[in-house]
Amino acid sequence: MQRLNSSRWRWGLFGLGLLLFGGISSQFRSDAKLPTLAPLPQDPYIQAYFNHSQASVYADPYRRISRYGDDLEQVMIDAIQSAQTSIDIAVQEFTLPHLAAALAQRQAQGVRVRVILENNYSTPMAQRRPNDFSFLDEHDRNKANELYQFVDLNQDGTLSPDEIAQRDALTILDQAQVPRLDDTADGSRGSGLMHHKFMVIDGRQVVVGSANWTMSDIHGDLGVEESRGNANALLVMESPSLAQTFGAEFALMWGDGPGGQPDSQFGLQKPPRPARLASVPGSVVEVQFSPTSPTRPWANSVNGLIAKTLGQATQQVNLALFVFSEQPISNQLWTVSQRGVPIRALIDPGFAYRSYSEGLDMMGLTLPDHRCKLDSNNQPWPTPITSVGVPTLAEGDKLHHKFAVVDNQVVMVGSHNWSHAANTTNDENLLVIRNATVAAHFQREFERLYDDAQLGLTPHLQQTLDRQRTQCGL
């Protein structure tokens, strides 16, 4: 294969960093042979899928392993292949080449395909330069390293044109002339985050969830044998009404498309949009999009809708959250708890024990930040609960969910993290779905995570509290 100019593609220290990841074995061990649980019934209009489901097994197409879980990428490919007229996608990150190839095929067959990305993840491999990565933080630098390794099929530390054409999702889209833009299309340097993860097909179907279209969010980290992907959910929803609502959100961000006027609207440039009902047979579905300006009533925001829905609980509340840092939601949960409603919460280990985590509030704890400051609005629960903690995850994997199950009847799910930034800055979505069949799927996922979770004041958390309090002289 012809090689690109070495000065362009031999990326110095960046390439050396790949050595930390090691080579990719052509064969990993299989940890799954048969499902351990029977599949739950699916609603005919709302199907729920989970990449860690114990009720199914699939073959990871990139790492060549058999593993438990629903193949979220294949679910999306099947939806793409069903498209007859149009596919509109808004997703923060997109690096999976099989998905890109499916879109390229539909584009070639006359289906209109349009893609919106977050600007930090919208540059194809062929246009990247070494200094593109020197300014990244450790998290994004590791992502860049893994993507480079993923595209470098023969693992020689150099990317060939053929490797890029086969493996780089954005290059595949560009070669197929799939139009795309990012959140700089409004003339700005980008919104807070274009954090959506949705697809609208033929004005009739919405595919939406918490997963980015990446190895880490769908299948697992490339260089970590034990990784099975960040825990995520995906919904396939058949509803022209819902598709129209998501289509309107897409249209605001798309404007007149690439190369046109800077008339795209992202972030707070979009008009205020209250929660609205969508018609889905057999369900009551509300949908709302972020952000909401801090100058508007908090109750009218997505976080306000979350708090309102939690406040209706009478039996139980179960939370599986990547991050939970919005104080008013914690305050609402305290009120619910005081009515005797059991509450259980799991938060990603990377965020659960940070000074701003509402998980600490629920446990009645306070933790100073690195400046020895306490959040001015911090409100630890006077009567703590011990059913709050972190799931046990494989190395490299995260609890990326953003869902709550209320009374085994209601699910809240979407791209929206329970944070101030998601509420007031980012492009996000939240669905409130009242459907016991759908709720049962999310309840099963919660129980899977809760089964071996580390709850309450763990030794690790106690050590963290003691260390920080000593450093701060408290």
For each feature predicted by the language model, list its residue ranges.
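N-terminal Sec-pathway targeting helices
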Residues: Q2-G17
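HKD-type phospholipase D/PLD-like phosphodiesterase module
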Residues: R29-A83, E93-G311, F351-Q409, H416-L431, ...
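Short, surface-exposed connector motifs at secondary-structure boundaries
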Residues: Q81-I87, V111, G311-N318, R339-I343
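Extended non-catalytic domains of envelope/secretory-pathway proteins
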Residues: T309-L310, L319-L333, S337, I347-A352, ...
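Hydrophobic alpha-helical membrane-insertion segments, chiefly the h-region
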Residues: G17-R29
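Low-complexity, Gly/Ser/Thr/Pro-rich intrinsically disordered linker/tail segments
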Residues: S290, N318, A404, Q468-L474
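Short catalytic-loop micro-motif centered on adjacent basic/acidic residues
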Residues: I87-V91, L181-D182, Q316-L321, A345-L346
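Cysteine/selenocysteine-centered motifs that mediate thiol-based redox chemistry or coordinate metal-sulfur cofactors
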Residues: S241-F266, R273, H441-L474
